[in-house]
């Protein structure tokens, strides 16, 4: 008999993922010993956490400030509000607000306590040392070449990722304006 299993291990940093992989391998070795079976392992692939680059972030922000913010139509505001009413959102619409009190106060005021359907404002420049969870190959790229990231509004405030609401918003003027 033969059996195969695929484990996908996720952690915030490459170093933590390597440690967790070693632990999972030991667990598999223990299971093989208990069942008197043979074990072979093969590493297939991995992704890296993004390396932050303050200089690039500052340059992107400097240019972002010069671009006019999107102006949404009444229909887009109504659509965003209708979508926002289909999911529960807790807290303020900004990861940075969770880690910085000044940002939290800014976002609270700009979003009327998180009630606004769209974030129609530019956040102050914020550099975070916190690695946010997510699936992206931007981390891999950042280990090879200078890389910076910006976030822009392409969906209603606090829309859950990987949701039908996110997909629905992706074909609207809200998303298109946010990307331009």
What residue ranges belong to the model's regions?
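Metal-dependent amide/peptide-bond hydrolase catalytic core
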Residues: 1-180
């Amino acid at each position: 008999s033969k059996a195969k299993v695929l484990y996908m291990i996720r952690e915030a940093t490459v170093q933590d993922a390597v440690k967790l992989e070693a632990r999972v391998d030991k667990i598999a070795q223990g299971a093989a010993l208990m069942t008197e079976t043979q074990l072979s392992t093969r590493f297939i692939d991995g992704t890296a956490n993004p390396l932050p680059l303050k200089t690039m972030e500052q340059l992107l922000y400097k240019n972002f400030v010069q671009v006019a913010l999107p102006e949404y139509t009444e229909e887009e505001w109504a659509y965003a509000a209708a979508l926002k009413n289909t999911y529960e959102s807790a807290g303020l619409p900004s990861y940075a607000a969770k880690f910085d009190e000044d940002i939290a106060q800014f976002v609270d005021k700009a979003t009327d306590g998180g009630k606004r359907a769209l974030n129609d404002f530019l956040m102050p420049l914020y550099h975070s040392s916190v690695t946010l969870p997510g699936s992206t190959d931007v981390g891999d790229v950042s280990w090879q070449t200078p890389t910076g990231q910006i976030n822009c509004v392409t969906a209603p405030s606090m829309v859950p990722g990987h949701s039908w609401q996110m997909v629905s918003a992706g074909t609207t003027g809200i998303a298109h304006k946010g990307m331009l």
